[in-house]
Amino acid sequence: MAFNLSKIFAHTDRDPLIRELTLDSRNVRPGDLFLAVPGIKVDGRAHIADALKRGAAAVAYEVEGATVLPITDVPLIPVKGLAAQLSDVAGRFYGDPSRSLNLVGVTGTNGKTSVTQLVAQALDALGQRCGIVGTLGTGFYGALQSGRHTTPDPIAVQAALTDLRKAGARAVAMEVSSHGLDQGRATALAFDVAVLTNLSRDHLDYHGTMEAYAAAKAKLFAWPNLNCRVINLDDDFGRELAGLKQESRLITYSQLDSSAYLYCRDAKFDDDGVRATLVTPQGEHFLRSSLLGRFNLSNVLAAVGALLGLDYALDEILKVLPKLEGPVGRMQRLGGADKPLVVVDYAHTPDALEKVLEALRPHAKGRLLCLFGCGGDRDRGKRPLMAEVVERLADGVWVTDDNPRSEAPTNIFDDIRPGFVTADKVRFIEGRGQAIAELIASATVDDVVVLAGKGHEDYQEIDGKRQPFSDLEEAATALAAWGPEND
């Protein structure tokens, strides 16, 4: 793909051919347009000279606060508010791919990954190939290429949508994070359906207050030309959002409020998932899903709402629901039968931990045991709150490392400890692998073991470096070593 610079920035004296866009000077290749913007940690304008050495055909830079620029024959384009325009710039370059896709945006503290994966699987089953952009990566269900951000940068998002469209996607289910909304990573995207799962404490290290966090999420539901909003009425913020006047269609869902468009009652949970009655304005329907837990039933309802928002018939949607699987690292089961049941889940907020433990309590014939940690360099205020939840709902608690990043694990433990009433009964173990091995070795065949916090992740971030690590692999190894003598 290559276009003249004038297609991207109309007012320019020279008009070189642009091969690609990039925000990182280290990725510049001859013919690229380097977009130099100040970031939280790095100012791209400090790397303009490097981009030119690597062959940049042009540079656009944030003019406010810019200092001395290199002397060059290459076009240097000053732009005021460049960061806020990146999504639109990338859209012009890539041909606005979202406008020829059915784009479903899913936001919320918990459940984004599950809902996007459910929507994608369902659309595939209904005959509309659906791509995915989110925490687990970008691509098609079962073949995702991992990325570092839930919502990629504005250029990466537009490039990903272009690639998915070329590969045959007619729809895309996309996780839309509060960071992505606040930073304008998706500004130029044409969302057809917006979904809210829930809102609870998270990311306050970035947003500062719950009000700012909620305001970032709310942006998605006032999106220009949005066709449909799908909102959870079992959530306080959801009820507030649903009460706002908007032109777009509103589909609400609930397990508690019978006034919801999708109201689910008489839910029966077992080891095979859930059976329930779905009440809609068109009548009652039987709903079946293999996913565990009441919170996953909410995720299923959110996916149903999104599919209705794309004008699929409810009867057709309900037919494919039993075939849909949960994502990797979300309530993922290992062991069981003649060994302890181990469940690996990404739960890393107080609310998510509470929902996971409540969902698994009925499955524990013996004890419900939980291992968790808290990420370094993130919201310290939620650390004691997570301790309170686990102590209240689990029979045994192991605290260990999550992704400590630049923090010492013992300092994170010190922040967690005040949340326990009886911290002397809690095991604090540095080294997540050792903690998992000890916990599973101590479990009996009737126990349920929850490994919370990392889910699908195949690394641990320590001192700024990602080291290979997988809860799933560690659990499998520990289960292989588990024998009847442990019981």
From Swiss-Prot:
It holds the Pfam family Mur_ligase. Its EC number is 6.3.2.13. Its cofactor is Mg(2+). It catalyses: UDP-N-acetyl-alpha-D-muramoyl-L-alanyl-D-glutamate + meso-2,6-diaminopimelate + ATP = UDP-N-acetyl-alpha-D-muramoyl-L-alanyl-gamma-D-glutamyl-meso-2,6-diaminopimelate + ADP + phosphate + H(+). Disulfide bonds: none annotated. The modification N6-carboxylysine is found at residue 217. Meso-2,6-diaminopimelate binds at residues 378, 402-405, 453, 457. Carboxylation is probably crucial for Mg(2+) binding and, consequently, for the gamma-phosphate positioning of ATP. The keyword Magnesium applies. It comes from the Bacteria. The keyword Cytoplasm applies. A motif (Meso-diaminopimelate recognition motif) lies at residues 402-405. It is found in: Cytoplasm. NCBIfam families: murE, PRK00139.1-2, PRK00139.1-4. Belongs to the MurCDEF family. MurE subfamily. This is UDP-N-acetylmuramoyl-L-alanyl-D-glutamate--2,6-diaminopimelate ligase. It comes from Pseudomonas syringae pv. tomato (strain ATCC BAA-871 / DC3000).
